[in-house]
Amino acid sequence: MKSMTNANVKEETVETYTIEAENIRLTYTLFTSTADYDGRKCYSLTVTAETDDEITSSTAHDITRRRKDAIRYFRMITRGLVTPCTLFDVLENIL
């Protein structure tokens, strides 16, 4: 997983999933990024948690370059109701 800081990165949403419970809304976004410096597409995940009091978010960049794997990881994350605080720990276990 890389941190993408290049201002010329192009992003495109692949899939989004939102689930709401009593006091929290979790939104999962799978997206592709294409960096101008190498032009290769990579897949990244964002998890956002919204409550009445705050919004927190975590993004894991460049988790894979294969669409099939990205969708599989995305579905595992959404089924497990992963939060922004646990995103990197969970990805570390499944990657």
Task: Identify the role of each PLM range.
Residues 1-31:
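Negatively charged, low-complexity tracts enriched in Asp/Glu with abundant Ser/Thr
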Residues 2, 51-95:
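Mixed-charge, Lys/Arg-enriched low-complexity segments
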Residues 7-9, 24, 37-39, 45, ...:
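Short linear motifs in intrinsically disordered/low-complexity regions
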Residues 10-14, 49, 61:
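Intrinsic disorder/low-complexity signal
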Residues 22-38, 88, 93:
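A positively charged, amphipathic N-terminal helix/segment that binds anionic biomolecules
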Residues 37-59:
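A short, structured beta-strand/loop element
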